């Protein structure tokens, strides 16, 4: 016999979506917010020559700048008010999360529930403003050194231009931070992830057209194009398979008698995903590495010689960059998994509800067992995230494809799509349950 939830899920169709007015409002709000974000990626900073910027980024589309531009939805290549995108906010969130594991004061705030969470969010916003201002000043200073055959990138360089750029870029990041929070609260899906997702999706058509053009002109052979297409499809299928994989730990509940009736005695399971951390580790790793490397790359031409050497040493496809990126992904996979799943708390909740894992004593033994299983799953998940993020990158650098179309972007697109679709299905299921409850109440009233 199918469960009630399975029967409801089987009945989900367009008619059920048409009746879910709340879901429709949330989707419209989400689409509207993302449209506003996309419009902002076309508003240029004051005082720059966009033609010069376009020439510079056209020459460096296959490097770190092209990779960051992909995450920014093309805003960096057009040098718009959203050029920094949401990356300073992500970096600040990483620093605060690491602080909760190191600093006792932040750790105490984390334990204080809703009030502590609000305080941590406030610190994250302060950190976002500081990081965005520092990075914006670095970009402004770097822009003043950009030259092309048509002239300089900055029309009137100086302190006024730098301060104006800092205000505009910092304000753009703050607005995106607020917009992401609004999408999460009033829309569908995680707002920050959807902003990054929409930026990548907006740049993919241009990347595909450029690839086909390279094939048409003979820069890339037909065989290489086929390899790239097959690789992309294979990576997508692999991501979907792994993201749906989970280890189910059997949980049993003892029988208990209430009056003359027996309750409990049933078996359930505790699902542990193979990749508990989701898409967060690659996003965190990209945020930590891309912003400083991009700043170094933008200032390398006008700085000391060692800065140029560092920019080349940390360039995309270089062993040092690959090693740092892989180490960051593995670290954030274990770190974020420990944030979202606490074996001790889970074991304590099972014990309070009378549940136990067969063959494992409740309490500390169950917590140790869950931690053991989770560590092994996280190790495999970290290898999976590293492979998906780096193996396509190695192939692309080998074939010299001049733009970023690697595994990280595919991972973000596929994972965010799956999470958002799952949330839509959850809203539809909740709407169907509400309909069933209303019908049962009406029948009871008639009787």
Where are these regions (language model features)?
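N-terminal cationic and glycine-rich segments that engage phosphates or anionic surfaces
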Residues: 2-110, 115-447
């Amino acid at each position: 016999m199918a469960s009630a939830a399975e029967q409801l899920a089987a009945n989900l169709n367009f008619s059920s979506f048409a009746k879910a007015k709340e879901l429709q409002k949330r989707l419209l709000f989400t689409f509207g917010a993302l449209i506003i974000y996309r419009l902002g990626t076309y508003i240029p900073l004051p005082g720059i020559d966009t033609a010069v910027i376009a020439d510079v980024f056209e020459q460096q589309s296959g490097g770190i700048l092209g990779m960051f531009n992909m995450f920014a939805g093309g805003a960096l290549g057009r040098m718009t008010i959203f050029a920094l995108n949401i990356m300073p906010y992500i970096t600040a969130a990483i620093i605060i999360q690491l602080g909760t594991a190191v600093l006792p004061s932040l750790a105490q705030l984390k334990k204080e529930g809703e009030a502590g969470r609000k305080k941590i969010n406030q610190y994250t916003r302060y950190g976002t403003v500081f990081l965005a201002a520092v990075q914006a000043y670095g970009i402004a200073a770097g822009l003043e050194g950009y030259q092309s055959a048509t002239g300089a990138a900055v029309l009137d360089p100086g302190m006024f231009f730098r301060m104006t750029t800092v205000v505009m870029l910092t304000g753009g990041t703050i607005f995106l931070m607020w917009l992401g929070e609004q999408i999460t609260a009033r829309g569908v899906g995680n707002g920050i992830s959807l902003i990054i997702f929409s930026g990548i999706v907006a740049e993919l058509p241009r990347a595909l057209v450029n690839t086909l053009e390279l094939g048409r002109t003979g820069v890339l052979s037909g065989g290489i194009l086929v390899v790239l297409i097959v690789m992309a499809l294979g990576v997508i299928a692999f991501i979907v398979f792994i993201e749906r994989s989970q280890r189910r730990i059997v949980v049993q509940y003892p029988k208990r008698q209430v009056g003359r009736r027996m309750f409990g005695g049933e078996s359930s399971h505790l699902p542990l995903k193979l990749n508990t951390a989701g898409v967060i580790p690659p996003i965190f790793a990209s945020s930590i590495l891309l912003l400083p490397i991009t700043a170094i790359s933008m200032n390398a031409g006008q700085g000391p010689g060692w800065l140029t050497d560092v920019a080349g040493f940390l360039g995309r496809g270089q062993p040092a960059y690959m090693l740092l990126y892989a180490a960051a992904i593995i670290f954030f996979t274990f770190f974020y998994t420990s944030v979202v799943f606490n074996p001790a708390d889970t074991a304590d909740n099972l014990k309070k509800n009378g549940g136990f894992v067969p063959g494992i004593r409740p309490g500390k033994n169950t917590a140790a067992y869950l931690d053991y299983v989770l560590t092994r799953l996280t190790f495999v998940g970290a290898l999976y995230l590293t492979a998906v993020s780096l193996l396509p990158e190695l192939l692309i650098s080998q074939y010299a494809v001049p733009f970023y179309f690697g595994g990280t972007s595919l991972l973000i697109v596929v994972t965010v799509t799956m999470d958002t679709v799952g949330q839509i299905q959850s809203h539809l299921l909740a709407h169907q349950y509400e309909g069933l409850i209303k019908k049962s109440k009406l029948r009871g009233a008639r009787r």
